[in-house]
From Swiss-Prot:
GO terms for biological process: blastocyst hatching; phospholipid dephosphorylation; phospholipid metabolic process; regulation of calcium ion import. Its EC number is 3.1.3.4, 3.6.1.75. One of its GO terms (molecular function) is identical protein binding. This is Phospholipid phosphatase 4. SUPFAM superfamilies: Acid phosphatase/Vanadium-dependent haloperoxidase. The record marks 206 as: Stabilizes the active site histidine for nucleophilic attack. The gene is Plpp4. It catalyses: a 1,2-diacyl-sn-glycerol 3-diphosphate + H2O = a 1,2-diacyl-sn-glycero-3-phosphate + phosphate + H(+); a 1,2-diacyl-sn-glycero-3-phosphate + H2O = a 1,2-diacyl-sn-glycerol + phosphate; 1,2-dioctanoyl-sn-glycero-3-diphosphate + H2O = 1,2-dioctanoyl-sn-glycero-3-phosphate + phosphate + H(+); 1,2-dioctanoyl-sn-glycero-3-phosphate + H2O = 1,2-dioctanoyl-sn-glycerol + phosphate. Disulfide bonds: none annotated. Pathway: Lipid metabolism; phospholipid metabolism. Magnesium-independent phospholipid phosphatase. Inhibited by N-ethylmaleimide. The chain crosses the membrane at residues 4-24, 49-69, 84-104, 142-162, 179-199, 202-222. It is found in: Membrane. It comes from Mus musculus (Mouse). It is a multi-pass membrane protein.
Length: 271
């Protein structure tokens, strides 16, 4: 119980840091006159995939898949616990890393011009006249948090399904339905990332790098709890594969149980 409490505490701390960084102001990068065209895209009020919906998809999809697998395969509580710990760590680390990069880089969004100058008229001092909160949020383009969270949560779901379905083991290779089922979450993550470019909220580099960050954390945290996808036991977490200490002690040979040689018929020779 103590180890579990520590694991939960680490994740709570990471999510706390993520929420804290949401309210910090980013670096105010100088915008050169010759690059202002990059940030003159229209300011879209209604996103295709709002932030709340993105978080719901990224957090609830892996949890729902884990619960469905438990019902179908009747997995034990230990396996459920390991899966929850893995995906929660991936999401927490991803949030902290993405927000840290956002604050340090301070890249303007594609619609930054109209956040800064709502009337479309730029002054010579380049001083923004728009809402300060809207302007500050407009300096958090790189990397895309929509993309990173989508690929973190849904990317983990892909790894989890690939392990459960044995997509890359001898028994599962060549069965296309298994592969299609496993990569479906990644397809959804890609759609979320691309929607941010359609909303003029991110440049293509923002969505691409965000996706890479999310996928890296998803794989790292998955491998912390599960064996490689090519392993024959890839459907089980490491905890379930460990041999209990009591069994190890029973199997260990002792001096009393060591085999002895028959002594009958053996006579002492000259020394």
């Amino acid at each position: 119980m103590r180890e579990l409490a520590i694991e939960i505490g680490v994740r709570a701390l990471l999510f706390g840091v993520f929420v804290f960084t949401e309210f910090l102001d980013p670096f105010q990068r100088v915008i050169q006159p010759e690059e202002i065209w990059l940030y003159k895209n229209p300011l879209v009020q209604s996103d295709n995939i709002p932030t709340r919906l993105m978080f719901a998809i990224s957090f609830l999809t892996p949890l729902a898949v884990i619960c469905v697998v438990k019902i179908i395969r009747r997995t034990d509580k230990t396996e459920i616990k390991e899966a929850f710990l893995a995906v929660s760590l991936a999401l927490a680390l991803n949030g902290v890393c993405t927000n840290t990069i956002k604050l340090i880089v301070g890249r303007p969004r594609p619609d930054f011009f109209y956040r800064c100058f709502p009337d479309g008229v730029m002054n010579s001092e380049m001083r923004c006249t728009g809402d300060p909160d809207l302007v500050s949020e407009g300096r958090k383009s790189f990397p895309s948090i929509h993309s990173s969270f989508a690929f973190s949560g849904l990317g983990f779901t892909t790894f989890y399904l690939a392990g459960k379905l044995h997509c890359f083991t001898e028994s599962g290779r060549g069965k296309s339905w298994r592969l299609c089922a496993a990569i479906l979450p990644l397809y959804c993550a890609m759609m979320i990332a691309l929607s941010r470019m359609c909303d003029y909220k991110h440049h293509w580099q923002d969505s691409f790098v965000g996706g890479v960050i999310g996928l890296i954390f998803a794989y790292i945290c998955y491998r912390q709890h599960y064996p490689p996808l090519a392993n024959t036991a890839c459907h089980k977490p490491y905890v379930s594969l460990r041999v209990p200490t009591s069994l190890k002690k029973e199997e260990r040979p002792t001096a009393d149980s060591a085999p002895s040689l028959p002594l009958e018929g053996i006579t002492e020779g000259p020394v």
